[in-house]
């Protein structure tokens, strides 16, 4: 395989100009010989005495070039003047020794050998082409059987296998009328005589005529391979090799170690084996040795070549002297240490250094402190240049000396060189693009890099010994890009969610909080001040304190109509601290933003507001000032932690005693047998959970308030100045939960498997733990540490897969012109709005006009980017859904358009062309991955009981609306009974916006009507949580069928009430075999005794009772619509483990089918049940035209529908987790996207991580990029093959233009790993996973990599087609086209 075009330095081929694609194919023997500079005939490497390479050996200088620059081997020709001369004595050409890195040799094999990649990588390509099984081909190749290559006139079949005995018998019988061969020769003969074009024709006909699915799949696969060979002009027999290329010697070096030993590359060993065996075989053939010996030697040669190409792929791996398997050519390129991931995608670079980081609290945001020693080393060449320019040194050598002596002038020059020259800092792991940022260096003494505290959040850095790397951008372009795009002060917003990432934390927050808190009756309370300067004087002369409440006149800056600032003076009631803080506010930011106690969230809002109102530059300056102020007041405040700050609540002892008494009572009940062990455990856990909460509440009440005397002399409560409370309250450090452990009680602990230990830890850290309590605590804590280590690796792998699947998504055009999009609504769960509509549509582009619901006028036209102003307007006008453009529906073929993506979150305006949005999406989802939990949650005691709700209440005033799936009937009492499966009551506020959405189960009684006005707290619906009713939709007289006591039903009498009921028995447990198949059903008769039919059909109403149903009606009873026929007791809802955290995100993106997946209705129609099989029930859905769709469902599963019920396509009919593939098939792309976005967001929301929906949508786009051809039409695709969506669109457009029939296709959902591997670019796929398979397939297909993605371009070393690289490539293409046009024109004129 000529993979080598990946590796050889491209200059040698005279390819100075850029290339735009790389093609891979199978090398023909002629090609291999044309690469070669001579045949390697001997296995010798170098002479152990002279260290000179042996002639014709593996390191031969005659073949591969001289060992020393411009010097032949025997030393006759030396120096440059003989360049190009070939020495007549030793035959070596005089040239540079680096040609030994690129000159190849070859080995002429004495017998053909099959290439193991085409034989063994599944599915076997040789097997596919020849239509033989891998086992058969191996038997032929490894000389266990003959294969008939030409049957002649005999009854033998072509490709038939014969054992040795068979062969000799047939020889006796038919003489030489037929040909049969053994080994690679036989296979090669078969390949050579295969008529590819004819075979394709036959297969196409077979495809038309056959009906079986497996056959179609098999034929389609074979067809694909044969067509690829036909198209690319490669010959089938090239998969069998006559000539073996030999890698250039400097790529498989042999290095002499001291003591006469050698370190060598494994490849040399492998090559030696091949040459030895090949030479032995040649000799045997010359001697006409017996067949059996020759065959053995040929087999050994085949095995030696196998090992060289891919050791260990077949049989045992060849091992070296030390028993470890040798590293073959295939091992060189695959895996983490292989060529792709080690050397091509990540390289070590020059002009870099690393050191420990420390705090630089006096720096400005765009600066960092760089140790002088490091700077001197990093900027050496610049310093040499300056020294020479200033005449202080005449040569580089002299300059070097000066620098090493560190003469004073050098430091002055260093200052000069470093000025305005940004450097890049990087902290590993680089999880998102903010892991590398540019700074202007400030020279400092010492050896540690100083980092600005506000960028720590982006780097996820702290100062407990973290190290960071420094890189110097050298070229002018690189410096420009670093300064304009990467400078820390240009990256204020996070690309994941558009919120500021430069947010103060810890000490700064604490200082600002302390500064802006107010105190009751502080010194000088109630004073009035003329301006801030006066406040300053009063504060510094100690007339007032920091927290004193005062009134002050403040000057604010407001924009007028012309957009210029003018001062406005207002009086504010505020505190001294806030008034002082107002001085650093940027122009245009109102004072009310700081006129409150600043906690972390408030500070974040403050910076966000500043960015939106005052722009980037002012915000950066403001952030810096906030930092200096915060640090200053944190120091002056002297807030520290003392043991006495952890106040233990007085009520603790009483609360503990109470809880202990309750537990004792439960234990007694358990001993008397009144409760089961499970109930006892749940209740005990419950009691202790509540006790812990009560103690925590008492403690917080105690901590958060303190009694003070106000000016009037009354005792009042004010917020406490307890240090620990202030730290937690401000959001600087710690939380209520941690304070609870310090001075409340530690509470319940979990075992490593997630279950809760019922003995709580009643002490806290201040009191100290007993030995037993300490042991219980360590149990779960250790799990946490193990989790964290695993989590990091898993999260990294998820990120890698995400990056791989999206790496070629770049914004390439401004607008694709589509009007498709998704309808966005607020996310409502239960009764709460989790994410408001404005947050979901902010920064998107509208797909259709947004219309005011009350007046009907257009608020926003289609194609508008929604800014803060616009979304606020939409919000106020009461619009509850907006159709916006989304990456999933973008029509751009390779890449995305700016309008479908919307706002670039990190810049706050429409995304630029060239932005690598795919990678940004992958990083935004992967980066918080390390914060997600690994554990799958077990719902503990307290949570599972809350699940058995029996009614639902409105939380707000408004109007009740029923969802479109809502189906209900009114019963005789006039109650509305729900008979639909996925019914919801939605509550809209007075302007028609959705406020809450409640699911209502089947059989619930609705207490509201559609369109009714309701009050908060009103009950909307009630139901019995413990049973599931079976409800009739028709009225009539009950007539039972197959309801026989003792056969299909059993009578049960309640001991307490004495009432008897009928319960349906499970078919397996019935006595006679005949009764096993009987299904107890109920039919309805009208007053004339005729069976009632389903309206509009002639099918009688018939409803089957499921197993375990308690029948509540009697034979002959008159019933009305909505009456209950039977109740099915619900098993107390089993606590299903919900997969949470990282594994859940991975599961969604890998599009895995969930365990125990639920089932959706394939068609809209009526449900009935067919004949049961042993463990399964047969569920039939019949549509309006009477077409039935059957499925078998195992009896353990809970079927949510019953006989005669009408279901809609895509509605859930069997309980369980939903399979995303089903959603796509039955409900379409929008429903699927909504499901995945919702589920992924759910996981991140639990951890309090904000990620913009569009990142998830970008990944969904990539998961949906392939389609299955359902009917090829006249497009040349093969029915059933998987192709890129863009290719089908293009082919269909072309077909329609030519008036041909377009192809029909079905959407396919691929998991991210699969999607990465099925990409068009083989280079990208090979560098991701399964390198061997990807390259084999690509070579057979003769694939061409268009180098569209980022990865392929990094690998071949071009500028990536994103950012500035996009414009570079575009202008290059334009120039090239212009040149082509010119040449075409000149040719025309010449002619």
From Swiss-Prot:
Details of cofactor binding: Binds 1 Mg(2+) ion per subunit. Binds 2 Zn(2+) ions per subunit.
Enzyme Commission (EC) number: 2.7.7.6
Residues annotated for Mg(2+) binding in this entry: 462, 464, 466
Family the UniProt entry places it in: Belongs to the RNA polymerase beta' chain family.
UniProt xrefs under InterPro entries: DNA-dir_RpoC_beta_prime (IPR045867), DNA-dir_RpoC_beta_prime_bact (IPR012754), RNA_pol_asu (IPR000722), RNA_pol_N (IPR006592), RNA_pol_Rpb1_1 (IPR007080), RNA_pol_Rpb1_3 (IPR007066), RNA_pol_Rpb1_3_sf (IPR042102), RNA_pol_Rpb1_4 (IPR007083)
UniProt-listed PANTHER family: DNA-DIRECTED RNA POLYMERASE, DNA-DIRECTED RNA POLYMERASE SUBUNIT BETA
CDD domains with a match to the protein in the record: RNAP_beta'_C, RNAP_beta'_N
Protein's UniProt keywords contain Zinc: yes
Cofactor(s) required for function per UniProt: Mg(2+); Zn(2+)
Keywords: DNA-directed RNA polymerase, Magnesium, Metal-binding, Nucleotidyltransferase, Transcription, Transferase, Zinc
UniProt binding sites for Zn(2+) 2: 816, 890, 897, 900
Reaction equation(s) it catalyzes: RNA(n) + a ribonucleoside 5'-triphosphate = RNA(n+1) + diphosphate
GO molecular function terms noted in the UniProt entry: DNA binding; DNA-directed RNA polymerase activity; magnesium ion binding; zinc ion binding
Name of the protein: DNA-directed RNA polymerase subunit beta'
Gene3D superfamilies named in the record: 1.10.132.30, 1.10.150.390, 1.10.1790.20, 1.10.40.90, 2.40.40.20, 2.40.50.100, RNA polymerase II, clamp domain, RNA polymerase Rpb1, domain 3
GO cellular component, one term: DNA-directed RNA polymerase complex
Gene: rpoC
Residues noted as binding Zn(2+) 1 in the record, renumbered to the chain: 72, 74, 87, 90
Gene Ontology BP annotations: DNA-templated transcription
Assembly description: The RNAP catalytic core consists of 2 alpha, 1 beta, 1 beta' and 1 omega subunit. When a sigma factor is associated with the core the holoenzyme is formed, which can initiate transcription.
Superkingdom as given in the UniProt entry: Bacteria
Its biological purpose: DNA-dependent RNA polymerase catalyzes the transcription of DNA into RNA using the four ribonucleoside triphosphates as substrates.
